UniProtKB/Swiss-Prot annotation:
MF-aspect GO terms: odorant binding; small molecule binding
Position of the signal peptide: 1-15
UniProt xrefs under Pfam families: Lipocalin
Disulfide bond is among the record's keywords: yes
Keywords: Disulfide bond, Olfaction, Secreted, Sensory transduction, Signal, Transport
Any one annotated GO CC term: extracellular space
Protein name in the entry: Odorant-binding protein 2b
Entry's family note: Belongs to the calycin superfamily. Lipocalin family.
Amino acid sequence: MKTLFLGVTLGLAAALSFTLEEEDITGTWYVKAMVVDKDFPEDRRPRKVSPVKVTALGGGKLEATFTFMREDRCIQKKILMRKTEEPGKYSAYGGRKLMYLQELPRRDHYIFYCKDQHHGGLLHMGKLVGRNSDTNREALEEFKKLVQRKGLSEEDIFTPLQTGSCVPEH
């Protein structure tokens, strides 16, 4: 009986911690800094970005929605992320993309880090995001440390212009 109670209690604690994690990450996030591989074409790097909206769909799934302009057209992108067994790790597009969501000591900041198997190669991209668009030096320093740990160059960090969301034509 004690074993059953312990199992149920641990399961409930795990479920509650997952719910808290989902609540922490949902909402609107402003992109403060980005980094991509050196191989990523300069002309394809996003210079203007909209806020990212993260929604919890239940069952360990999150949806990230954002918009961007391409050839004078507003494009809306939705990415369905499925939680993996590793805390903070999600997969998308049938496992082709792996995303790591890391909360920073400043609770209002996260690092979204993505590995994308694209055209036979592996692309790495990182975003420092916050609940508001204000600059935070501590969060930026943490982002720089992650960039170095992942083997990316601090010189490749750039700050895109924060824009409002555009409205796609349907």
